[in-house]
Amino acid sequence: MLWVTAGQSTPIRLLNMQTGRASRTALRVAIRRAAHQAIDRPRILEDPIAVCLIGPGYERDMERAMHFVARDFRLYMSVRSRYAEDRLAQQVAEGVEQYVILGAGLDTFAYRNPFAALRVFEVDFPATQQWKHELLAAAGIAIPNNVTFIALDLEHKSLAESLLEAGLNAAEPAFFGWLGVVPYLTLEAFRSTIATIGRLPAGTAVSFDYAFPPETLSAKRRQVFDTLSKRVAAAGEPLQLFFTPEDLEKELHAAGFSRVEQFDTDCMNKTYFKDRADGLKLSPVRVGMLATAWV
């Protein structure tokens, strides 16, 4: 039971938003993933659920995602999901049978999961999960038996307690997807979360994205950051946590992780956009990076 009791005092904030309010950022991400399915060929991520989940009424928003300025965000949302799912597939091949999606939002993996033995835990705020249930029902998308929802009461339970109560086997490794969450956290919440994951058995891993400190960015990157920062702050979900790659690795190693992969824009383009006839690729003016850490 040490996995539960150590470091329990810090509640986990999956997103910085008002209690009882579904995430507007989660909707924007879902619209961009859906737009990728409708617009880009070949697709970076095959997601037949994305368009039907958000339902009708967002056609104009999907059209905006075609604009040059919005294109990079559209592509990045699909790349980061593909990256995490590629790392998940690697862990499944090594025997991992538990997948925890932290801040799941409108993520669709659980409804197109190709791994019969993989159990999926979706963790998010109660309001966001209720909204997702409504969208799934409206779209006629059944919830598979191997999917468990964890509506985390941030004021009363730790992540570890909630996962154990939901049936996570802490004696076995797990893979964690943590996309679009870290930049919204406090440092204390980030450390508490990676400490919880870091106490799981060897073979456990987590994939996530993070943002660079604004003061370290070039003028062009700072302009991109400022635009994004103002937009999410206006939605009530301000960016507040940043790392240099070196500082991030120190945090992860201190939490018990033995290996860290840093996956920058150049890696993303070489891996997911190589030899495309349409010339699509991510702009080099990105303000963050993808990462995976293994216990």
State what each model feature region is.
Residues 158-160, 184-197:
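A short, conserved alpha-helix within the catalytic core of class I
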Residues 200-214:
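Conserved beta-strand signature within the Rossmann-like core of class I S-adenosyl-L-methionine
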Residues 153-156:
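Conserved SAM/SAH-binding loop
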Residues 2-4, 11-100, 104-150, 170:
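Rossmann-like AdoMet
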Residues 173-188:
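A short SAM/SAH-binding and catalytic strip from SAM-dependent methyltransferases
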Residues 159-170:
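Short amphipathic alpha-helix with an adjacent loop that forms part of the alpha/beta core around
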Residues 24, 219-295:
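Rossmann-like AdoMet/SAM-dependent catalytic core
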